[in-house]
Structure formats: structure tokens, C-alpha cells
Amino acid sequence: MATSRYEPVAEIGVGAYGTVYKARDPHSGHFVALKSVRVPNGGGAGGGLPISTVREVALLRRLEAFEHPNVVRLMDVCATARTDRETKVTLVFEHVDQDLRTYLDKAPPPGLPVETIKDLMRQFLRGLDFLHANCIVHRDLKPENILVTSGGTVKLADFGLARIYSYQMALTPVVVTLWYRAPEVLLQSTYATPVDMWSVGCIFAEMFRRKPLFCGNSEADQLGKIFDLIGLPPEDDWPRDVSLPRGAFSPRGPRPVQSVVPEMEESGAQLLLEMLTFNPHKRISAFRALQHSYLHKAEGNPE
């Protein structure tokens, strides 16, 4: 099916994954988001899409069968405009008008009510637990790709795209923010699903602060800002396979969470620290975070 079926309405934005367009499906009247990517053709006599891209798209289509409420829907996939070297693949997603960044900016002072934050976090974690249960690491969670519908439903977007888009991203000189990146990513160590839980912690704090928690301007600067809060981790937790040694950072102890998020109650601070745990093997999972008492008790009630 061709993308010409959809009527372009507006350019939504340009990011690491290329240009995103809002379009209308004239058959249903629904709005969709079109994300196009250039993929280098595979080798072999027939050329065509590389098998890795075919597998990634097949996985996204398989997830779609579950219709998880907290994951943005993939409506269609179109391959068009083939040349000898590359194919344009267009992913057609459901369109949601605002992301979490816009949602937070629109909240009147003093910000979101705590119960709203807890509701958003429960939905966020349910969507992420679903992705992790299906062996998908998002790798780029940030407020801009967490969508919030007008009815308050959270939907995760841009998951499963990192490998599909690796070629496009090499062609697109967009600065990717470091602010939500886990220490193991900043150190260029091996990583898996725990990287997403670090990002969740950064976003959790931002829901209260209404500004990012760690704003570094390089990998080393970002790590320094992280250690200013959680303290310099012990030698045993420092990954072995990295070029940046622990000794590059001055010793420092942890600071109380309330020094950066004063509005957060103690059990919320405990949950945040379990997300912002340096060692990924000790970091809380999305499944376990969903069971945490903080997300199941009313504000101000005892444990």
C-alpha cells in the first residue's frame, strides 16, 4: 500500500529519525504520523531490504497485534522509492497531539498533582514492561517520545527503531541529548533493558522539577553531574570494558534526593534511587517498579 493514500497535513518536526509528518487517512478520517527512513539495500542478487530491517519491522508488526494501550500503534508499513542503493520505508503510526514535554510545560504552577504523576508513571512503566517482556530495549526514552493523549493516556513512541534508523541517523547531523542516558551508555559499555529504567528515573524526577535532572554537555560532564547526586560508585560496580576509568572522577558521597526534588516524599525518593542505581544489574526493573508501594498508596498516607 502506498503512502499516497494519506493526505499530508503538516510537518511535525525533524529529529534523529528524520522528518515526521502529520497526515490524514481519508478512508477513516483519522490522523496518522508518517515517519520515513532511508534503508540501504541488502546484498545478494535481488538487493532489496536487508534482512535485519525486515526482522525489525516484523517485530513491530507482531507487537501491534497485542494493541497495548500504552504503546503507540503502528498502523502500516510502506516501502517506496527504491533506487539501486536504498529503499524508503515509511512507518505509519497513530497520531497523538502532544508529548510529555508539552504536557509538563502546559501544567499550571506549581506543576502536576502528585496523583497525576503516579498515574503517568504507572502507565509509562506498563508500556515499558510490555516492551521489555518482548525483548525490546527502547534506548532513547525522553519526554519528547512519551506521548500523552487528550484523555491522559500515556503512549511510548519510537521504540524498536534504533537499529532500523542507524543508517538514516548517520546521514542526519542531529545532536542526540545525553541527559536521559544511563551511565553504561555514556561509558560505551554493554547494555540491555536496564538502560531504559535509568531514563525512567530521570523523567520521573523531571515530572516534579519541570526541568531535566542532569544537564551535561559531554559524556564525562554528564557522568559528573550524575555522581554529584548518587555519589561516586564503588570500584566493584565500575564496568571493566570501558576506556574512562573511575579515577577520572573525584570521590564524592551521595546527596539526599530531596536536595534536587524537594516535593518528593520518602518512598518516592527510594523508588527514584532504585531507578538511578549505577550498576545496571542492581537497577530496578519496570515489572518490579510497578509493584513499588509508592505507586499504590495515596499521597501522605502511611506505608
Swiss-Prot record:
EC number in record: 2.7.11.22
Gene Ontology CC entries for this record: bicellular tight junction; chromatin; cyclin D1-CDK4 complex; cyclin D2-CDK4 complex; cyclin D3-CDK4 complex; cyclin-dependent protein kinase holoenzyme complex; cytoplasm; cytosol
Subcellular compartments: Cytoplasm; Nucleus; Nucleus membrane
Enzyme class: transferase
Active site: D140 (proton acceptor)
Activity regulation (UniProt): Both phosphorylation at Thr-172 and binding of a D-type cyclin are necessary for enzymatic activity. Full activation of the cyclin-D-CDK4 complex appears to require other factors such as recruitment of the substrate via a substrate recruitment motif, and/or formation of the CDKN1B ternary complex. Inhibited by INK4 family members. In resting cells, the non-tyrosine-phosphorylated form of CDKN1B prevents phosphorylation at Thr-172 and inactivation, while, in proliferating cells, tyrosine phosphorylation of CDKN1B allows phosphorylation of Thr-172 of CDK4 and subsequent activation.
Residue ranges constituting the Protein kinase domain according to the UniProt record: 6-295
Residue ranges crossing the lipid bilayer per the database entry: none
Ranges for region Required for binding D-type cyclins: 50-56
Reactions accelerated catalytically: L-seryl-[protein] + ATP = O-phospho-L-seryl-[protein] + ADP + H(+); L-threonyl-[protein] + ATP = O-phospho-L-threonyl-[protein] + ADP + H(+)
Gene Ontology molecular functions: ATP binding; cyclin binding; cyclin-dependent protein serine/threonine kinase activity; protein serine kinase activity
Gene Ontology biological process terms, A to Z: cell division; cellular response to interleukin-4; cellular response to ionomycin; cellular response to lipopolysaccharide; cellular response to phorbol 13-acetate 12-myristate; G1/S transition of mitotic cell cycle; positive regulation of fibroblast proliferation; positive regulation of G2/M transition of mitotic cell cycle
Coiled-coil region(s): none
Modified residues (N-acetylalanine): A2
Binding-site positions, ATP: I12, G13, V14, G15, A16, Y17, G18, T19, V20, K35
Family statement drawn from the similarity comment of this UniProt entry: Belongs to the protein kinase superfamily. CMGC Ser/Thr protein kinase family. CDC2/CDKX subfamily.
Known role: Ser/Thr-kinase component of cyclin D-CDK4 (DC) complexes that phosphorylate and inhibit members of the retinoblastoma (RB) protein family including RB1 and regulate the cell-cycle during G(1)/S transition. Phosphorylation of RB1 allows dissociation of the transcription factor E2F from the RB/E2F complexes and the subsequent transcription of E2F target genes which are responsible for the progression through the G(1) phase. Hypophosphorylates RB1 in early G(1) phase. Cyclin D-CDK4 complexes are major integrators of various mitogenenic and antimitogenic signals.
Subunit structure of this chain's protein: Component of the D-CDK4 complex, composed of CDK4 and some D-type G1 cyclin (CCND1, CCND2 or CCND3). Interacts directly in the complex with CCND1, CCND2 or CCND3. Interacts with SEI1 and ZNF655. Forms a ternary complex, cyclin D-CDK4-CDKN1B, involved in modulating CDK4 enzymatic activity. Interacts directly with CDKN1B (phosphorylated on 'Tyr-88' and 'Tyr-89'); the interaction allows assembly of the cyclin D-CDK4 complex, Thr-172 phosphorylation, nuclear translocation and enhances the cyclin D-CDK4 complex activity.
Protein name, entry field: Cyclin-dependent kinase 4
Species this protein is from: Sus scrofa
